[in-house]
Amino acid sequence: MGEALRGLKRTIMCGEPRENNIGQKVTVMGWVQRKRNLGGLIFVDLRDRTGIMQIVFGEEINKEAFEKSDNVKSEYCIAVTGEIVKRQSPNNDMETGAVELKGEDIKILSESETPPIYIKEGLDASENIRLKYRYLDLRRPDMQKIFMIRHKTCKVVRDFLDENGFLEMETPILTKSTPEGARDYLVPSRNYKGMFYALPQSPQIFKQLLMVSGYDKYFQITKCFRDEDLRANRQPEFTQIDMELSFIEEDDVIELNERLLAKVFKEVAGIDVKLPIERMPYKIAMEKYGSDKPDLRFGMEINDLTEAVKNSEFKVFKGAIEAGGSVRAIKAGNCATMGRKQIDKLQDFVKTYKAKGLAWIAYKEDEIKSPIAKFLTEEEMKAILEKMDAKVGDLILIVADKNNVVFESLGALRLHLAKELDIINKDEFRFVWITEFPLLSYNEEEGRYQAEHHPFTALMDEDVELLDTDPGKVRAKAYDIVLNGEELGGGSIRIHDSKLQEKMFNVLGFTKEKAWERFGFLLEAFKFGPPPHGGLAYGLDRMIMFLAGTENIKDVITFPKNQNAFCPLTEAPNVVDENQLEELGIKKIEKED
């Protein structure tokens, strides 16, 4: 049975003692990292979230404490009182390596079984074990550093927004389901049988209502929920830094957030963010990088060869151009000697993105080698090489297809090759704003337009008339902040005119009745003088991944779910009592085979 503290107070953390503390009598508390018994002396490394310090117990120091210390094992939770002294053999690998604690008294606060995982940095254990014993995984120093980074990030964000006149305000977690986009998590109501709340995918509508309410600068750090198929770095619940401002335009939101990003990255990670951050229209991002989340740490931009081969009789090029598509290519330097098997793998790769194939031209010292050379005239080959600014050693990779297929396949191939060739500078942080997104996309299956972001996004002023004539060409006052090929956050200016908002719902295929059924409270609010407003939200978890230097989102969330949205620690979701279901008016239906 563990000993009680009985008024004993911790006076210093394990990672704090330095030479200026020599001679002080202190009490430390923490977990035993390891113990070494050298006969007349016992050394214990004691750990807490600030670091590790060495404690020495000896018969000459205190016989009772010495004998008691021999009983401790790894992960025992103990308290030790003694004097800080200069260490005879300093350990330069430890922050506290110049000193040690002479253990004069020890309390064993609780014992520990042998842990199923090692509590050390760089743990090599299965994800399932780490999640099942997450409370042990979180003791590891590298994990604790991550959550100190997370805490500091939130503090810097709060301080910055407070200094800039923002109010931290909460919005509801139990809200109304407005199915548009990802699936909602639904919560049955006991008071209203057969009816459900939804957990918010974002605070979007409520923060707009706060603007109508006159709270012109709002923010919160909040949980959001999406019941979607999980990819590698997605979680069913995630944290968002959310903000909204009134009486502003795009430039105001962007300028404020550039200053916020510069402050966060400098104060938390010592990273300088060059301001102003580059802005790139969506159209340019797709044409040059094949992605609305371009990684700018390396070149290999996409080039348009359509003009160069517009008169070609090569049926692959000709067919793509006649169908309204294009012929585009990327250039991989020093890859002309790439073997046929490697190129075949690249062809298989682009086919996963619906490309029909991958043409290639290898610019070698003594020849230009290509399986399509026989289908091209000398002038066409020369035009391609000139357009690509090709040099000896270059490998040109070409896709001819519909534009969306060309962009997606070459964009993915560009990233794939950059990783394979190891040409990405992992120490570089390249930010870019992507602007002028399409407002809408057409859903062929449903026969209607869908909002690319959400139905409250404002249109670019010069495109308003296109909403009646050609909705697919309308651009949005939307902006995403991208870092090293990952979306860090995104936002937009919102529609604040009730008639325009109703018109938008109509374009999206909502009847007036349906729009009022789902969003009536917002449309009603817009009758009462809504201000021009807009905002932005960051994925906090993804931001911490960059600041902490980890590629796994589960590392930055205290108790994450696994790839199947299951928690190995608590075993949630779980079967609930039939009485609970009955109280909610819910009956389980057994699935037929």
Swiss-Prot record:
What are the BP-aspect GO terms? aspartyl-tRNA aminoacylation
Q: Where in the cell is it found?
A: Cytoplasm
**Which Gene Ontology terms of cellular component type are present?**
cytoplasm
Task: Write out the entry's keywords from A to Z.
Answer: Aminoacyl-tRNA synthetase, ATP-binding, Cytoplasm, Ligase, Nucleotide-binding, Protein biosynthesis
The annotated subunit structure for this chain is: Homodimer.
Question: PANTHER family attached here?
Answer: ASPARTATE--TRNA LIGASE, MITOCHONDRIAL, ASPARTYL/LYSYL-TRNA SYNTHETASE
- What biological function has been recorded for the protein in this entry? Catalyzes the attachment of L-aspartate to tRNA(Asp) in a two-step reaction: L-aspartate is first activated by ATP to form Asp-AMP and then transferred to the acceptor end of tRNA(Asp).
Q: Which family does it belong to?
A: Belongs to the class-II aminoacyl-tRNA synthetase family. Type 1 subfamily.
What is the name listed in the Swiss-Prot or TrEMBL entry for this protein?
Aspartate--tRNA ligase
User: Could you tell me the gene encoding this protein?
Assistant: aspS
